[in-house]
Amino acid sequence: MSAFKPTAPAPALRRVAILGGNRIPFARSNTAYATASNQDMLTASIQGLVDRFELHAQTLGEVAAGAVIKHARDFNLTRESVLSTTLAAQTPAYDVQQACGTGLETAILTGNKIALGQIDVAIAGGVDTASDAPVAVNEKLRKILLEANRQRSTGGKLGALAKVRPGMLFNPALPRISEPRTGLSMGEHCELMAKHWEIERAAQDALALASHEHLAQAYERGFFLDLMTPFHGLQRDNNLRPDVTLEKLASLKPVFDRSASGTLTAGNSTPLTDGASCVLLASEDWARARGIPVLAYLTYSQTAAVDFLNADDAQREGLLMAPAYAVPRMLAQAGLTLQDFDFYEIHEAFAAQVLCTLKAWEDPAYCRDKLGLTAPLGSIDRQRLNVNGSSLACGHPFAATGARILATLAKLLAERGGGRGLISICAAGGQGVVAMLER
C-alpha cells in the first residue's frame, strides 16, 4: 500500500469581479424578434461581449446560461450558442434553469467557482423568447405516437395510429406560463398578494411611470452604449414608453382580475418579452493581466423558497414573496441593514410585487412572525430604487433579467466611484434569488 499523500491546501477565496455586460435590446413578444430563436439571441448577446472585450479565440473557464421556455432541440442551448461565437471551441458551457432567477443564479454559480480558484473567468447570462414558443402536439396524440413507436410490428404501429382522431391534429398544446400546482398565472397570484397587502392601484401605476421615466433618461444620457448590442434592427427596448403618463396608465383595465377589485393592468405588469443578456466575471488577477478595469464585485448572495400551497391561510405565503426571506438572510451574513445600500435593484415582475415586498420589510408582525426578526427591516430610500428603470419599462425575458440587472448595477457603482447595491429577483415556484454588489 502506497503512503498517503496529502492534497495541496485549498487556496484562499478570491474576490469575484464583474467586468462588464452585454445584452440585446428587449422586445415585446411577436414584434422585432418574432422569428429569432433562443440560440440566435443568446449567441448575439455573448458575441457582443466577446467583441467588446476582444475575447476572440480565447478559452474561458466556462459559460453558463439558461432559458425558461425551451424547445427540445435546445437541450444544450448554451454550448451550441458558444460554438456559434468566436470564443474558442474549447470553452465549456452548460445550461441552468431557476425560472426568473436563472440569469442571476448563473452568475452566482460561476462566481463561486472563480472565488474557489476553480476557474479564472466566466460568462453568465440568460435568454428567453415567448415568440418562438414550443408548441406541442395534443397530449392524447402524443401518447398515441409514443405507443406506436413502442410497437415492434407494422400491424401494431397501424393499430396504435388508428386511434388518431382528426380533432387531435388541430388542437395543439400551447405553452402557458402558469403554476402547475395551482393553475394560476403569475399575474393572478400577484393579484392575490396585492389584495392581501392592500396595495393600491395608484401606487402600482406610479411605480410603472417611474420605471419608464428612469429608463428613458438612462437611454438619453447614453448609459447603455457599452452594455448593449443592436439586434434585428432594434437599438433600444421596444416596450419603453417615454410618453407614458399616470392618466394613460389609469385608463387601462385590469387583466388578471377583471372585477372592480382588480388592480394589475398591462401597464403595471411586465409583458411577455424576448431577449438575452450576459455578464463577464473574472478574478482580479485575470482582469489585471489584461488591463480590464473592474466595475464591481459580487460579494454576497442568497436564495429562498416559500410555501405558497399551504392549506392554512395563515401559513400560506404569496408566490412572489421569497425575496422577502432571502434578503434578511443575506444581510445577516454581511452584517448589514437594509438601509446600507446606495442602489436597490428590485426586479419589477409586477409593480404590486415590488410594493408587497417593500411593505413586508416594513411590517413588524411579518418580520417577527414570518422572517424571525426582532425588528422590521424598515423602509428604503425610494430615490435609490431602480434608478435606471427596470422590467416594467424594458420588459422581462425571464432568464435574461438577472444579467441585465447585474450589468446595470455594476456600471452604476463604477460611475459613482464606489458603494453597494442590492439585487432582488422573484421567481416562479415561490422562489427568490438575491445578491449584493460592492465597489
Feature names for model-found ranges:
Residues 34-152, 222, 228-238, 339-361:
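Conserved beta-ketoacyl condensing-enzyme motif
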Residues 38-53, 77-81, 106, 186-193, ...:
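Short, well-ordered amphipathic alpha-helical segments that serve as non-catalytic structural scaffolds
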Residues 98-128, 136, 194-223, 278-285, ...:
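Active-site-proximal alpha-helical scaffold in enzymes
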